[in-house]
């Protein structure tokens, strides 16, 4: 039986053709002697056309569901069912892990207008637009249609040189607040949720949170609350709008928001192989959800489809270690699916997860080949990952070096699903080809493409379709995923085995996002 299954392994990873997937022959540490022979013959089962077929299927699902595959929508449910069905057919044990989360969408653009003393209409940040208006609707704001008098709450005008405003951070800031008024609150030293909750408790009919005013803190606030539950409209605004509304006293405004903010059920898709040591789990993941505003084919259909293609090829191959693939939900709302998984994994099971590999946005059209900086050799941002992360980084470096492909590092900045694993000391790594960041001239010289332009100009937009994919980046990175899966699936000494965990970099969850409005890839 094992011999027959080993023959099936010959069909795993592609030859290097125009859209085939190169497999760099990186031998597993102390692997089964037969593995190198298996690796050298792994052809036909993992090809870029197969990955593209999955991407087209995800696009079709989005097309049939209002252009989105966001967590909590029928588009995501159908995506999860599609992945699960493919995995079961390939021989995996599949679990749909349910969890509840806060769903939010802005159904139409909001209104903010000054009625008196000087009539004026402010420009909204349109739903799904990357162009900032004068104000925005905060994620998890309630719907509402309010006309009321603006009442300033403990503002610091002019602002201090360094951020210091505590406006709205204490219930006592609202002493003397007139019920039904619109609370005008300044960004500062506490979470937006705290400000909004205090305003709600004081009887405010709506809240406007404007930027604090220091250099770098003047643009429109793009913020989020911790979840559904604040039952009044909550807007973020620029410092200029805040100054405008703060004086004179008695200014009257009209606010209208049209949102859906509620708790919904979604699922992670978890697939375990039937082979390998259950005490040595090699975990590979990608988030499956898109943003509400688009189909999410690069972000992150690319990582999801690449992982799925590799998993299909590996399903009936008896590996030395247990392989576990995961497709996370609600990553776009703050890594919620992966965080739920890690938080609810019993300690004895968590200790069996020996490493985690994350693949988020692996086919950006203006790509750079980025490897997560496990050893902090780039000396930027967050510190090194847990012990073993450096070895993972070196494996991917060797893969690209073998193919004579340039590569560079990318920081563990907490924007994707490795965050919860790093936080608990699990060695982590992965690949990334860039999001809304701007490609440098040095990167353009290495990878081609256009310097001065985003890696993905359709990031978090409706144009993130199957046309928004680099076939070359998709092929190279899928080959890297397949290589890592085989290497770690058969390795007898996994990265970081027996070593103490390094200090974990700070992950970006809703608590930290509240201060700057940033979430994830």
Task: Briefly describe each language-model feature range.
Residues 137-168, 224-297, 309-312, 316, ...:
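Soluble metallo-hydrolase cores and metallopeptidase-like ectodomains found primarily
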Residues 31, 37, 44, 56, ...:
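Noncatalytic luminal/extracellular "stalk/propeptide" segments of secretory-pathway proteins
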Residues 279, 292, 318, 328-435, ...:
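Metal-dependent peptidase/peptidase-like ectodomains
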Residues 37-46, 64-75, 184-190, 195-196, ...:
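Second-shell loop/turn segments in exported
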Residues 1-31:
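Secretory targeting and sorting signals
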Residues 502-521:
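Acidic, Ser/Thr-rich low-complexity intrinsically disordered segments
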Residues 48-67, 73, 84-90, 162-163, ...:
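Catalytic-core environment of secreted peptidases
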Residues 438-506:
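His/Asp/Glu-rich mid-to-C-terminal helical/loop segments that flank catalytic regions of hydrolases
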């Amino acid at each position: 039986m094992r011999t027959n299954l080993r023959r099936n392994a010959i069909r795993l990873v592609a030859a290097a053709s125009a859209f085939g997937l190169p497999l760099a022959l990186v031998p597993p540490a102390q692997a089964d002697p037969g593995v190198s022979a298996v690796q050298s013959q792994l052809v036909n089962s993992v090809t870029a056309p197969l990955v593209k077929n999955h991407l087209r299927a995800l696009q079709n699902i989005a097309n049939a569901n209002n252009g989105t595959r966001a967590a909590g929508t029928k588009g995501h449910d159908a995506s999860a069912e599609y992945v699960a069905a493919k995995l079961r057919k390939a021989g995996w044990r599949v679990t749909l892990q349910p969890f509840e989360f806060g769903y939010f969408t802005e159904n139409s653009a909001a209104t903010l207008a000054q009625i008196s003393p000087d009539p004026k209409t402010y420009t909204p940040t349109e739903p799904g637009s990357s162009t900032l208006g004068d104000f925005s609707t905060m994620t998890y704001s309630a719907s509402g249609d309010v006309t009321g008098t603006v009442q300033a709450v403990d503002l610091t005008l002019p602002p201090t040189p360094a951020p210091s405003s505590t406006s709205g951070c204490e219930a006592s800031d609202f002493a003397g607040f007139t019920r039904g008024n619109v609370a005008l609150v300044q960004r500062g030293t506490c979470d937006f949720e705290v400000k909004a909750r205090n305003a709600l408790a004081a009887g405010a009919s709506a809240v406007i949170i404007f930027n604090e005013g220091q250099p770098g803190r003047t643009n429109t606030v793009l913020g989020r609350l911790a979840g559904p539950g604040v039952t009044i409209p909550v807007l973020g605004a620029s410092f200029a709008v805040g100054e405008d509304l703060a004086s004179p006293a008695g200014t009257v405004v009209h606010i209208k928001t049209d949102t859906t903010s509620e708790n919904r059920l979604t699922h992670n898709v978890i697939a375990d192989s039937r082979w390998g040591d259950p005490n040595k789990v090699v975990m590979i993941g990608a988030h499956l959800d898109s943003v509400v505003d688009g189909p999410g084919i690069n972000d992150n259909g690319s990582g999801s489809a690449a992982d799925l293609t590799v998993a299909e090829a590996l399903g009936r191959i008896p590996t030395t270690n247990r392989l576990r693939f995961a497709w996370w939900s609600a990553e776009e709302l703050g890594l919620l699916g992966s965080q739920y998984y890690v938080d609810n994994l019993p300690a004895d099971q968590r200790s069996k997860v020996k490493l985690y590999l994350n693949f988020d946005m692996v086919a950006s059209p203006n790509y750079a080949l980025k490897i997560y900086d496990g050893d902090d050799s780039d000396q930027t941002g967050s510190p090194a990952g847990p012990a073993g992360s450096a070895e993972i980084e070196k494996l991917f470096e060797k893969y690209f070096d073998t193919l004579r492909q340039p590569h560079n590092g990318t920081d563990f900045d907490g924007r994707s699903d490795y965050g919860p694993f790093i936080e608990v000391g699990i060695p982590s790594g992965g690949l990334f080809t860039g999001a809304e960041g701007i490609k440098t001239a040095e990167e353009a010289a290495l990878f081609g493409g256009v310097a001065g332009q985003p890696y993905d100009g359709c990031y978090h937009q409706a144009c993130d379709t199957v046309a928004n994919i680099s076939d070359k980046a998709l092929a190279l990175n899928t080959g890297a995923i397949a290589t890592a899966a085989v290497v770690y699936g058969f390795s007898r000494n996994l990265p970081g085995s027996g070593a103490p965990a390094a200090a974990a970099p700070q992950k970006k969850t809703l608590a930290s996002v509240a201060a700057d409005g940033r979430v994830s890839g």
